[in-house]
Design a protein with these regions (language model features):
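Conserved substrate/cofactor phosphate-moiety recognition/catalytic segment
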Residues: 121, 125-166, 264
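The conserved Walker
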Residues: 112
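A glycine- and Lys/Arg-enriched "phosphate-lid" helix/loop adjacent to the NTP-binding pocket
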Residues: 192-259, 272
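C-terminal accessory "lid"/substrate-recognition subdomains
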Residues: 251, 259, 265-285
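Hydrophobic anchor at the beta1->P-loop junction of P-loop NTPases
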Residues: 108
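Nucleotidyltransferase catalytic core that binds NTPs
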Residues: 1-104
Length: 285
């Protein structure tokens, strides 16, 4: 349950009880709330805390004290409905553990030397970071020499996903990501000569991709593999095919570096126009 997990993360020593019996249909000041709460919590209630006046009557029905928290909405100038409808405008008021639910993820993919790392850093600095770096680069830097093995690519995905989960708690409304399991699956095809179905089973599509074209000059780097333009183009074609095979939402970004920046900024601005869509928070259903 989404809200229950949030509360348990924020207050690990508290016992969180979910009232999920249709009581949500009652008005907040309905006197039936007292018996409903006693049914879920038969023990004595010492205090009822809230930011609205209805808690006074609720506390009385439970023989408890009331405590109205921030009644003028100065510390938290928005209610839960406003946050859900426009979370990006209230981002600073959303606790870290809640942010990933409302966050959108934008992943940068493309062949080597097309600006993935640069663009992820650029966008994070412009719109608020941090961003999720490519885990494969430090792995490549410190690995032993020799051909890649399938299990190494799984290890790279493990590291990347773990970093993403942690960094998402501190990121802005858009989580910028350099590379992901889908691109790692394409790397498997390039390095091993065949696909890895068990690796592809781990693909989790973001809200949107930026696919960077290979039409910029190659920049030499000891951690890079495919400098020949025909191999870069093959890599690009494989990525594009993989995106389309999985029905991924993506924008092709091409041209000079300044053109790539402008196109990428436009993508982010479009993503920020609407909140992330959900079927609803389970505790509200």
């Amino acid at each position: 349950m989404v809200r229950k997990s949030w509360m348990e993360s924020l207050f690990p020593e508290a016992v969180v009880i979910v009232v999920n019996n249709g009581a949500r249909l009652l008005a907040s000041n309905d006197p039936k709330w007292g018996p409903i709460i006693r049914g879920f919590h038969p023990e004595a209630v010492d205090r009822v805390i809230g930011s609205e006046g209805y808690i006074v009557a609720l506390a009385k029905s439970l023989n408890a004290q009331h405590f109205i928290l921030d009644p003028m909405w100065m510390a938290f100038p928005a209610n839960s409905i406003e946050v859900r409808e426009d979370p990006f405008s209230h981002w600073k008021s959303i606790p870290d553990h809640v942010r990933p639910y409302f966050q959108k993820r934008l992943t940068l993919v493309g062949p080597e030397s097309t600006g993935k790392s640069y663009m992820a850093d650029f966008l994070a600095k412009k719109f608020g970071g941090p961003y999720v770096p490519e885990y494969g680069r430090p792995y490549e830097k410190y690995r032993s020499s020799g051909d890649y093995r399938a299990e190494e690519l799984h290890f790279i995905v493990d590291g990347h996903v773990a970093h993403r989960k942690t960094l998402s708690l501190k990121a802005g409304p858009i989580l910028f990501e350099d590379t992901d399991p889908l691109l790692t699956a394409v790397w498997a095809e390039m390095l091993l000569g065949h696909s890895l179905p068990d690796l592809e089973a781990r693909i989790d599509l973001p809200d949107h991709y930026i696919l960077l074209d290979a039409n910029v000059p190659w920049e030499e780097d000891p951690l890079r593999y495919y400098s020949k333009q025909e191999l870069r183009q093959e890599f690009f074609t494989k990525i594009k095919s993989k995106l389309e095979a999985y029905g991924a939402s993506y924008t092709l970004v091409s041209g000079s570096w300044s053109e790539r920046e402008a196109q990428s900024v436009a993508v982010v601005k479009e993503m920020l126009k609407t909140p992330k869509l959900h079927g609803g928070i389970d505790a509200q259903k």
